[in-house]
A protein has these predicted regions:
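Active-site metal-binding motif and surrounding structural segment of the metallo-beta-lactamase
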Residues: 48-89
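Metallo-beta-lactamase
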Residues: 2, 6-8, 12-16, 21-23, 77-80, 84-125, 133-134, 161, ...
């Protein structure tokens, strides 16, 4: 897909960028988290060089995080460009061994207050992330979406390996507090994210 020309900063240390990929006929969203240990790029799609330089700024890129087996996108290119390791579940890389892959498991801390949560029953290798600073932020792979005509809801059942199991797994997120929720597919939720998630999960019982 073509490189995106710009990004949106939604907090001092959080930015997103997005673009349409005709190959999958979907709008794809990517996230940059700025930590004291460097930037983490999550499910990155291509970004024009000038915008990328502005996004990264003076900080190093500490890692590229892949949230499931379908979200490799430009991760390999970014990892090579910045000499940064890839982070993800082993199941997210089923077809090849990545020499610089740092495997993550449920509850692992990728960095300080950045935690990975396994989401079983969604797409193979699915994780969600919780970034605790500034009232908390969830970053979701495919298990939750927020775009029309669906709105904020679960990944449609036809794309899940086990929808009921996915809903149970998503309840693990309720152990964390998050003001914001960012998606790989959909518009960010910028307030009351934990409450919105609880309402969605309770309504699915």
């Amino acid at each position: 897909m073509r490189p995106v020309s710009d990004f949106d900063r939604i907090a001092s240390n959080i930015a997103i960028w997005h673009g349409y990929d005709s190959a999958v006929k979907a709008e794809l969203y990517s996230t940059c988290l700025g930590t004291s240990g460097g930037n983490y790029l999550i499910d990155p799609i291509p970004l024009e060089s000038e915008a990328l330089s502005e996004l990264v700024g003076s900080k190093s890129v500490a890692g590229i995080i892949v949230t499931n087996c379908n979200h490799h996108r430009a991760s390999a290119e970014f990892a090579e460009k910045f000499s940064a390791p890839l982070f993800g579940r082993t199941e997210a890389f089923p077809n090849k061994a990545e020499p610089d892959l740092k495997r993550v498991a449920d509850g692992d801390k990728i960095y300080d207050e950045l935690t990975a949560i396994d989401i079983e029953g969604a797409v193979e290798g699915e994780i969600a992330l919780n970034y605790a600073p500034d009232d908390g932020t969830f970053i979701i792979g495919d298990a939750l979406i927020n775009f029309e005509p669906y709105g904020f809801t679960f990944l449609p059942a036809k794309y899940c390996s086990n929808g009921k199991q996915m809903r149970r797994s998503l309840r693990k997120l309720l152990a964390f507090k998050a003001k914001r929720m960012l998606f790989s597919h959909g518009t960010p939720i910028l307030s009351d994210a934990s409450e919105r998630l609880r309402s969605l999960l309770d309504g699915s019982l």
